[in-house]
């Protein structure tokens, strides 16, 4: 069994408490439709732009090594009436950056949004920098927002003549409310005759239950599941021109989602997450630990006095093999998640050993769930 330090024990203890909290919850919890599905077409749009950050304390791009930074600086100064063509520029306070952000759905002109600023050249840090006016473009090439402002950096970098230290990523930062929306995306929701609900986790049963909940609420068959991820809603006549009011009511309806039995395994951290619908057929599980220890203790061989011999090192290797914890447990047919965990814990199995056991049970065809390894 793999050894766990104090930090690992604490982490597993916290995971166990969380698992108990979930197991103590109702077996058939309901969720709002708002938490299960999105309105198709109501989404964010990604924006991107290229700009310059100035005001860096000598940690910017090396202009001789990064030609696009030098060209951008020259072009910007020329637009402001400063001609530096042919002049030597030696500043280290400028960095070329990419600016990204998400345009919120239904954002109107003047709405502010956050942006992320990332260095493109060899700048060591963007600490203390200010982003100059940067147009942000959508996938269609149109400008939807303009960004500018002082950066907030999550890391730092410092160096001396013989040593340096870096924490976090000092070449990446954010500007809260650093962009202003200049163009709106037209989306006439209130004039739509049909609306589609896009499920976040597609499932036939959940889609059918959502449609049934909407139809029961409206008293007419206006909702119909199209596929596992889509429910189409025909807007009733009394809500034409006021679709927002209808969707406000529908979002609050309670539905019991159905999920696929799945086990998620993160081999790097040893974390295992199992859904409540995981079932196991009859299977016997044996678990034991084989430990091989090898120790080297070289010996010195001294020659007799007044002899012509030489002092030499002779190797000595001790190999030991120990096996402990051999146990066999029978997991009965159709056991629940809690019974499975209790049974495996009875063998003294840790999280990392449990990963291999679950994969072996799946290979034997005795586990009724999908296993996804991250």
From Swiss-Prot:
Residues 1-29 form the signal peptide. Residues 296-316 are annotated as: Disordered. GO terms for cellular component: bacterial-type flagellum basal body, distal rod, P ring; outer membrane-bounded periplasmic space. Residues 296-311 have a biased composition (Polar residues). The keyword Signal applies. Keywords: Bacterial flagellum, Periplasm, Signal. One of its GO terms (biological process) is bacterial-type flagellum-dependent cell motility. The keyword Signal applies. It holds the Pfam family FlgI. GO terms for molecular function: structural molecule activity. It is found in: Periplasm; Bacterial flagellum basal body. It comes from the Bacteria. PANTHER family: FLAGELLAR P-RING PERIPLASMIC PROTEIN FLGI, FLAGELLAR P-RING PROTEIN. Belongs to the FlgI family. Assembles around the rod to form the L-ring and probably protects the motor/basal body from shearing forces during rotation. The basal body constitutes a major portion of the flagellar organelle and consists of four rings (L,P,S, and M) mounted on a central rod. This is Flagellar P-ring protein. It comes from Nitrobacter winogradskyi (strain ATCC 25391 / DSM 10237 / CIP 104748 / NCIMB 11846 / Nb-255). The lineage of its organism: Bacteria, Pseudomonadati, Pseudomonadota, Alphaproteobacteria, Hyphomicrobiales.
């Amino acid at each position: 069994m793999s050894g766990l330090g104090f930090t690992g024990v604490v982490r597993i203890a916290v995971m166990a408490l969380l698992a108990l909290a979930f197991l103590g919850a109702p077996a058939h919890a309901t969720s709002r439709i708002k938490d299960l599905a999105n309105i198709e077409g109501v989404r964010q749009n990604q924006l991107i732009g290229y700009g310059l950050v100035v005001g860096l304390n000598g940690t910017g791009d090396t202009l001789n090594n990064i030609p696009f930074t030098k060209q951008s600086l020259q072009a910007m100064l020329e637009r402001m009436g400063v001609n530096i063509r042919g002049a030597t520029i030696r500043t280290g306070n400028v960095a070329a950056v990419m600016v990204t952000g998400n345009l919120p759905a239904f954002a109107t002109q003047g709405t502010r949004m956050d942006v992320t600023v990332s260095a493109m050249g060899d700048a060591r840090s963007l600490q203390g920098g200010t982003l100059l006016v940067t147009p942000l473009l959508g996938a269609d090439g149109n400008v939807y927002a303009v960004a500018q402002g002082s950066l907030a950096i999550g890391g730092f970098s410092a160096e001396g003549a013989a040593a340096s230290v870096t924490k976090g990523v000092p070449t990446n930062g954010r500007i809260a409310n650093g962009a202003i929306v200049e163009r709106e995306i037209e989306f006439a929701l209130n004039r739509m005759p049909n609306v589609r609900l896009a499920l976040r986790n597609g499932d036939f049963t959940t889609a059918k239950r959502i449609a049934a909940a909407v139809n029961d609420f409206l008293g007419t068959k206006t909702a119909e599941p199209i596929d596992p991820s889509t429910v189409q809603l025909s807007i009733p006549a009394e809500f034409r021109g006021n679709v927002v009011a209808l969707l406000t009511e529908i979002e609050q309806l309670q539905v019991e989602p159905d999920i696929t039995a799945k086990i998620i395994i993160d081999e790097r951290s040893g974390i295992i997450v199992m859904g409540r619908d995981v079932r196991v057929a009859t299977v016997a599980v044996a678990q034991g630990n084989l430990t091989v220890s090898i120790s080297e203790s070289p010996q010195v061989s001294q020659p007799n006095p007044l002899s012509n011999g030489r002092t030499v090192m002779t190797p000595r290797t001790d190999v030991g093999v120990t096996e402990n914890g051999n146990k066999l447990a029978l997991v009965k047919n159709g056991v629940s998640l809690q019974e499975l965990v209790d049974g495996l814990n009875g063998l003294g199995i840790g999280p990392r050993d449990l990963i291999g056991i679950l994969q072996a049970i799946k290979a034997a065809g005795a586990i009724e769930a999908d296993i996804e390894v991250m």
